[in-house]
């Protein structure tokens, strides 16, 4: 990684907070948490490594967190409320700003399709507080409702399966303002 003060490249093994780690899986996604300053590294088959200057790196996996649906992390997104959304090769989860974890299980769409396994590639939240997911296998998924009240969640799918898109593979998504 690049050292901010000097601009020089530094191997992670030479960063004190990373000492003790033998090796790291391939990096897939990264985000810096706005309030805490933590940097979350989403890894291919390695979960999430949480870096906070001056502290030993924390390693989050499906075994020690309630929001990871798979250890293959493919997308990270922090919304304006401070909730950190995590897309994986297997689903979507969120660590709320208050530390509460939520894992999305089966999503039932209003056109009788359902999804228990999705490969999330990108995540964005719009001004209406809706979450949009780009997926490799189910096109775009639109989530409305309050994640703090799971019974209010509703899901809509835009994909080749329901003829709302010409493909099921969507790699990124952007909010047009």
Predicted regions and their residues:
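Carboxylate-rich, polar loop motifs that coordinate divalent cations or form catalytic acidic clusters
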Residues: 1-177
């Amino acid at each position: 990684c690049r050292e901010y003060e000097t601009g020089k490249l530094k191997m992670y093994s030479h960063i004190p907070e990373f000492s003790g780690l033998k090796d790291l899986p391939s990096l897939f996604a990264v985000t810096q948490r706005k309030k805490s300053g933590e940097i979350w590294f989403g890894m291919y088959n390695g979960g999430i490594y949480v870096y906070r200057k001056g502290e030993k790196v924390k390693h989050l996996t499906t075994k020690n967190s309630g929001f990871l649906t798979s250890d293959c992390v493919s997308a990270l997104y922090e919304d304006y409320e401070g909730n950190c959304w995590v897309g994986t090769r297997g689903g979507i989860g969120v660590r709320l700003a208050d530390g509460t974890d939520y894992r999305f299980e089966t999503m039932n769409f209003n056109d009788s399709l359902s999804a228990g396994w999705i490969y999330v590639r990108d995540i964005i939240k719009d001004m209406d507080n809706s979450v949009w997911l780009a997926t490799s296998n189910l096109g775009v998924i639109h989530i409305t409702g309050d994640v703090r009240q799971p019974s209010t969640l509703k899901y809509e799918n835009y994909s080749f399966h329901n003829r709302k898109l010409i493909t099921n593979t969507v790699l990124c998504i952007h909010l047009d303002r």
